[in-house]
Amino acid sequence: TTNVTLGTRYAKKPLELDIPITIAGMSFGALSGSAKEALGRGVSIAGTSTTTGDGGMTPEERGQSKNLIYQLLPYRYGMNPNDLRKADAIEVVIGQGAKPGGGGMLLGQKISDRVAEMRTLPKGVDQRSACRHPDWTGPDDLKIKILELREITKWKVPIFVKIAGARPYYDTALAIKAGADVVVLDGMQGGTAATQEVFIENVGQPTLGCIRPA
């Protein structure tokens, strides 16, 4: 069997998947609403999960996704506390494999009327994305943040912590100590259109090389 259950450590409603393969976060804006809807339908048929990505949750993907993971990112564009309660899991993003330790750039050409409304941004203007969360700064604060998210969701859903492939041994240990149900390890092969080439090509470690120390 390929069934996987995630979140049995604390969550009242662990995430149950038929296959151990999921779709990582891709933002609304980089993808259209219909593409997000199609991914939701696909994962529902396959029995796995998809992830919101930057910019928040769209009604299309929530309506079609049996299992939807809500990403809580440092820059909080499109973050809606009510959507946290609609998610089947929450992923606190500390790092991204394609740009560990770095923020990003949301190009103005991606900011349509709808994207601008969801993210509370001016249309057509480039926006830099922060690399640090505004309300916590270290592992002790992360523990408090995870508890806050559990209270918001009434301890129902698993809390993931996503780390970049940089210091897998130490970062995994800190995430577990902070109370994460799942640690998501993102290696340098991950792609992004929202950072400099020097990050994409030269920073981070491959996923397979990170698994053993993690």
What positions do the PLM features span?
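N-terminal capping/small domains of soluble enzymes
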Residues: T1-H133, D141
